[in-house]
Amino acid sequence: MKFLLNKIFNILLISKIGLLLTCILLFSSCNLYYNLFYTDPTKCFDNAKCHKPYDAIIVPGFPHDSGKVNIVLSQRIKWAYYLYKNGYAKNIIFSGAAVHSPYIESKIMRLLAIEIGIDDSHIYTETKAEHTTENLYYSYLLAKELGFQSIAFATEPAQSSFMKPFKRKFKLKFDFLPIVTDSIIKLNIKFNPIDESSTFVSNFIPLKERESITKSLRGTRGRKVKKEIHASKLLKRKQNHIAK
């Protein structure tokens, strides 16, 4: 009887140890995933306090419908305003072409930003990007061309988290500054009507009619940008070889 009880006890002990190890592994995996792929707004903002002011922040565009400022566009512009007015950013780069509507996203954002009080001399626009990876990469190149050294990517946590592996893979030097919702809720900002005519593309064809779903998904995942990065690296190698 004593032998049987000891055996049962050992089995239960092993089961508990196994369960504990499983929980530890799951927790470690979740923590690893969190650190690798999620841009925590609070942590990123605390980091920004140590590195501000950034020479420039990159703010990706979003489709605009005439006469309306949708919630996503509103949040991104308000966040840019908050960072600019509170000394976190010296300059702002708005990025985006006319992608899903006939209005050039970056130019619409610029007009709205000026309307709420951001100095136009500190606003730049990147007008080629049609996907998030392009928003980031093309604006990053523009920032470097303008001589900006410290750069941050300012958007929703979900979108910035999507860009975390991209940054790591191509060793781009910038910080993430995802929106801290509590900060923009407190802002008393109302968007007044703007003259949108300068941002309108008359012969506009939406992206969904220019690209298949497969091609569009590849663009979202950065296929076009990856090709451009590899081509740029190859060109530099050739130039260095010729110089030698």
Predicted regions and their residues:
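Short intrinsically disordered, low-complexity coil segments enriched in acidic
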Residues: 2-3, 26
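N-terminal Sec-pathway targeting helices
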Residues: 3-19
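Bacterial N-terminal signal peptides
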Residues: 16-28
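A structural signal for short, hydrophobic/glycine-enriched beta-strand patches
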Residues: 31-205, 233, 237-244
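Accessory cap/linker subdomain of secreted extracellular hydrolases
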Residues: 193, 197-224
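Low-complexity, Gly/Ser/Thr/Pro-rich intrinsically disordered linker/tail segments
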Residues: 213-244
